[in-house]
């Protein structure tokens, strides 16, 4: 339906914008940050961004489900599951970590520092594998989703190319840059998501006009 497609397009554009903005205002992953208002604001925004991306991806996938075929389904599942994990983790960062920080500050820092590549002092069990699992889903999902966009020839191929570029840049930035600068690798990903949302919006308008 037209209305749902428009909602998905707007969700993708807003999510991409939030994803870019939070890279510039994210507090340091230290215990002193956990109880500040900015920490809560940033991670509530991150949670909202993850939910919005899931809505946007659903609309983007459904618009070209036939053209996406099996590869596109795999890409959608991987990329979408990453944002499910992100939403859960952001919720914990926003509302649980600040509570833990009072009685167990080191444990709180170990948890929120998972994606900052800070060595954990406490044994986090299976949670310690989350960054590696997330990296595979994020990079692999974005890469395959970009390839699927290009192959489908429904939405902007430029947006698909930008997703691929963002996926390639991410692990390189992680290997070469400090975490504060590594965050900037999210900018092309955010732009790619915005572009896809805009492309979906324009495609819907064109379809309606025809």
Map each language-model feature to its residues.
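Hydrophobic, aromatic-enriched alpha-helical segments typical of multi-pass transmembrane helices
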Residues: 1-210
């Amino acid at each position: 339906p037209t209305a749902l497609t428009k909602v998905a397009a707007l969700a993708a554009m807003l999510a991409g914008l939030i994803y870019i903005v939070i890279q510039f205002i994210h507090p340091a992953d230290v215990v002193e940050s956990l109880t500040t208002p900015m920490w809560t604001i940033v991670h509530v925004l991150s949670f909202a961004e993850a939910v919005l991306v899931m809505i946007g991806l659903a609309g983007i996938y459904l618009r070209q489900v036939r053209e996406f075929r099996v590869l596109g389904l795999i890409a959608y599942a991987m990329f979408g599951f990453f944002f499910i994990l992100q939403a859960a983790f952001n919720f914990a960062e926003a509302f649980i970590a600040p509570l833990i920080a009072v009685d167990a500050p080191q444990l709180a820092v170990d948890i929120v520092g998972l994606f900052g590549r800070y060595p954990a002092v406490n044994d986090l069990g299976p949670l310690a594998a989350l960054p590696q699992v997330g990296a595979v889903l994020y990079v692999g999902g974005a890469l395959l989703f970009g390839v699927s966009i290009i192959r489908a020839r429904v939405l902007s191929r430029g947006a698909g190319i930008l997703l691929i570029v963002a996926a390639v840049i991410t692990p390189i930035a992680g290997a070469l840059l400090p975490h504060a600068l590594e965050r900037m690798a999210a900018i092309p990903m955010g732009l790619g998501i915005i572009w896809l949302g805009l492309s979906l919006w324009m495609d819907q308008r064109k379809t309606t006009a025809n």
